[in-house]
Structure formats: structure tokens, C-alpha cells
Design a protein with these regions (language model features):
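Lipid interaction determinants
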Residues: 1-147
Length: 147
């Protein structure tokens, strides 16, 4: 058995932001995404709001300014190495959609119960207010292997 219980793929269940007793959903209550941890110390996360509109064009680097703005404000992505420390994990960000995160280390506090994972952030600014993120994940079902 792998001594690191984070290894694998996890599917987002909820992404909440807490400020005192106030709870908000920065990407909506129907946000979706995945976080993945590899056995050799790499991680990546992708989270998006539900119901994102398609661009009018099929040019992957195209889109109107309005389309790009909407897409950017409804998506979170970063990747890099990580360090598992039992009660917390440190994400050492090497690539990120939000450029200010590149080169930073982000702490996430861990609560793990079977195939359910809760990652909690220290306070950070979300929509102009200091909030703590709470991201609930469930282990993704193993993909069927082709015969």
C-alpha cells in the first residue's frame, strides 16, 4: 500500500469560500474539476465553473475580449511539485493560469476519510475579501483498462 494517501486522481465535489459564518461559492455551486497527485511528487489541479459558454470561434487561441475575460474569471489551474506532510500538503507551483502563483508555495490542510478528501486553505483574497477555501474531493473511480 502506498504510504501517501493523496496519490491518485480526485474529483471536485464542492468548492466553498468561508469568511467567518459567511459561505460563498467562488465558481458557483456547480463547479467541477480534478486534482491529481503522482507517486513521484507532482500535482496538478483544474477547476472550472459550471455552464461555461463556448467561444463563437473554434480557434483555441482566439475568442473575443469578452469571451476571454469570462473564460479567465471562471477557471483555476496550476501544477508543480508537492510535499505531503501528513496533516497538510505544500503545493510548489511551477505553472499557473494566475501568473502571481508561479514560484509560490501554497499550503493546504488535509482531512482524509476513506475516499473523501477535504483541502482547506489558509486565508487568501477571493473576490476582494479574505476567505479560507474549502475544497471537498472524492477519489475518482479507476478508469477501465482496455483489453
Amino acid at each position: 500500500m502506498n504510504p501517501n494517501p493523496l496519490v491518485g486522481a480526485w474529483r471536485l465535489v464542492t468548492y466553498e469560500a468561508h469568511a467567518g459564518d459567511e459561505v460563498s461559492y467562488p465558481l458557483g455551486e456547480d463547479a467541477s474539476g480534478y486534482i491529481m497527485y503522482t507517486a513521484d511528487g507532482y500535482m496538478s489541479v483544474l477547476i472550472m465553473a459550471g455552464g461555461r459558454a463556448n467561444f463563437a470561434s473554434n480557434d483555441i487561441l482566439g475568442g473575443t475580449d469578452e469571451e476571454k475575460l469570462e473564460a479567465a474569471s471562471t477557471f483555476i489551474a496550476y501544477a508543480g511539485q508537492y510535499e505531503f506532510l501528513g496533516d497538510r500538503v505544500i503545493h510548489k507551483i511551477q505553472t499557473a493560469f494566475y501568473p502571481n502563483r508561479v514560484g509560490t508555495e501554497q499550503t493546504r490542510f488535509i482531512q482524509l476519510a476513506g475516499d473523501e478528501l477535504l483541502l482547506t486553505t489558509p486565508p487568501m483574497v477571493i473576490h476582494g475579501t479574505s476567505r479560507s477555501g474549502r475544497l471537498r474531493w472524492e477519489r475518482a473511480a479507476p478508469r477501465a483498462r482496455p483489453v
